UniProtKB/Swiss-Prot annotation:
Species this protein is from: Tropheryma whipplei (strain Twist) (Whipple's bacillus)
InterPro entries: ATPase_OSCP/d_CS, ATPase_OSCP/dsu
GO molecular function, one term: proton-transporting ATP synthase activity, rotational mechanism
Subcellular location: Cell membrane
Membrane topology field: Peripheral membrane protein
Assigned protein family: Belongs to the ATPase delta chain family.
Main location: membrane
Protein name per Swiss-Prot or TrEMBL: ATP synthase subunit delta
Record's keyword terms, sorted: ATP synthesis, Cell membrane, CF(1), Hydrogen ion transport, Ion transport, Membrane, Transport
Self-association and partners: F-type ATPases have 2 components, F(1) - the catalytic core - and F(0) - the membrane proton channel. F(1) has five subunits: alpha(3), beta(3), gamma(1), delta(1), epsilon(1). F(0) has three main subunits: a(1), b(2) and c(10-14). The alpha and beta chains form an alternating ring which encloses part of the gamma chain. F(1) is attached to F(0) by a central stalk formed by the gamma and epsilon chains, while a peripheral stalk is formed by the delta and b chains.
């Protein structure tokens, strides 16, 4: 969880993102921050003036940063890594509105990517591997996800090549999904069932979850034949598990408790 300074700065950037005039520069600065811990520390340092920070970015990118990027590095950040995550988020949000006619198309493609990665664990391990060179990862992404929008491919290639050590590729895609959903004013609900829900069931579930979480809900349905009856729903860290397996487990625990006191 980011500190209060980072949360405040991030909220400010979200409100001012429309002022960003250069999507490519967001990407370039994110890459620079991803590969250089020293640069991250310098750009959040309070001992370095805003003018010096702007000059540093200009030297590294070969061009003067736009006003939005200057504003981002002038804000206060709790930790250096928070500045990197902020640029990643701004790049994804800006991609939603500037590369896609409909943000939902972006989210649907990310869902498609997730389904492939979840079905092929070796793909996640390969794209998360530190030893694999960037050009090999880019070739793999363009091959596996052929036909994806260039905006989607740009985000996937960025995370595959520049993700931080403690993150995995699938985790980064999930990060992107949450941002795009938020840009749509929604939250994602992962629904795991034994068989596909009917349209009526989906509509009813969306209505119930929307009222519970007080926000628009977008369902991502996962079919798992190992799930016996009922549904399992996860929205962020909240889990609602109404499967038969859970009910049987609770029943078994109840019998165990009774035996303890018998």
């Amino acid at each position: 969880m980011p500190g209060s300074s980072s949360r405040s700065s991030l909220a400010h950037l979200r409100n001012r993102l429309s002022e960003c005039s250069d999507l490519q520069s967001l990407y370039e600065v994110a890459v620079l921050l991803a590969i250089s811990r020293r640069l991250r520390s310098s750009l959040v340092s309070r001992s370095l003036s805003c003018v010096s920070k702007q000059k540093l970015i200009a030297e590294l990118t070969g061009k003067d940063p736009d006003a939005f990027i200057c504003m981002a590095v002038s804000l206060r950040w709790s930790e250096p890594i928070d500045l990197l995550y902020a640029f990643e988020e701004m790049f994804i949000r800006a991609s939603c509105t500037r590369r896609f006619a409909d943000c939902r198309d972006f989210l649907d493609e990310l869902f498609w990517v997730s389904s492939i990665v979840d079905s092929h664990k070796i793909l996640d391990k390969t794209l998360s591997a530190r030893f694999l060179p960037a050009y090999s990862k880019k070739q793999l992404i363009s091959g596996v996800f052929a036909g994806a929008h260039e905006g989607t491919l740009a985000v996937l290639e960025y995370f595959a090549c520049y993700m931080q050590k403690k993150r995995a590729f699938r985790e980064c895609v999930f990060f992107a999904e949450k941002i795009v959903a938020d840009e749509l004013g929604a939250q994602i609900a992962d629904v795991t069932t034994e068989r596909p829900l009917s349209r009526e069931q989906r509509d009813e579930l969306v209505d119930v979850l929307s009222r519970r979480f007080k926000r628009r809900i977008i369902l991502r349905e996962v079919i798992n034949e190992k799930v016996f009856g009922g549904v399992r729903v996860q929205v962020n860290h909240s889990v609602i598990d109404d499967t038969v397996a859970v009910h049987l487990n609770n029943l078994a625990l109840s019998f165990g408790a009774l035996e303890t006191f018998s």
